[in-house]
A protein has these predicted regions:
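Hydrophobic helical h-region of N-terminal Sec-dependent signal peptides
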Residues: 6-10, 14
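Positively charged n-region of N-terminal signal peptides that target proteins for export
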Residues: 1-4
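Short solvent-exposed beta->alpha transition segments
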Residues: 22-26, 30, 40-87
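Sec/Tat signal peptide C-region and signal peptidase I cleavage site
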Residues: 15-20
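Residue-level detector of flexible, active-site-proximal loop/helix-junction positions
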Residues: 11, 50, 126
Length: 132
């Protein structure tokens, strides 16, 4: 009987992890879709309270993304990679190809709030030949 409960517990935990992973991917995809429509108000809604506090308005946030993260603003291709946990935060790794064909590895730091998963920051690295 102990083995049965252990198996059920593992299944429940795995199911929760899969649901969280799907929710995280949905948030990132939805924000990218909003950027593609230049809908910075909607894109801003997917940012954490910390990020919203840093930029104050959707317009300022949109300008930052357009100028600092053009591969996110206008990606040619988006591929979700692994999900990791680091320092209590969930990290979703994403490979993005920009309009010029250059590959970038992005680490989306996600936090879970009362509103659901939100983006708390993005770290970008140009992908080398080994990551393509």
């Amino acid at each position: 009987m102990k083995h049965f409960f252990a198996a059920v517990l593992i299944w429940v935990m795995a199911t929760g992890a899969v649901k969280a992973n799907d929710d995280v991917k949905s948030v990132i995809s939805s924000q990218i879709d909003a950027f593609l429509q230049d809908d910075f108000v909607t894109a801003f809604d997917f940012a954490s309270p910390m990020i919203q506090g840093m930029f104050g308005t959707p317009e300022r946030f949109g300008n930052m993304v357009r100028n600092g993260y053009p591969m996110v603003w206008r990606p040619a291709d988006v591929e979700f990679l692994s999900t990791d946990e680091r320092g209590g935060a969930l990290i979703q790794n994403v490979m993005i190809k920009d309009a010029g064909g250059k590959l970038f590895l992005l680490e989306y730091e996600m936090i879970e709030t009362e509103k659901g998963w939100l983006i708390n920051g993005v770290r970008v690295q140009e992908a080398g030949d080994g990551l393509a």
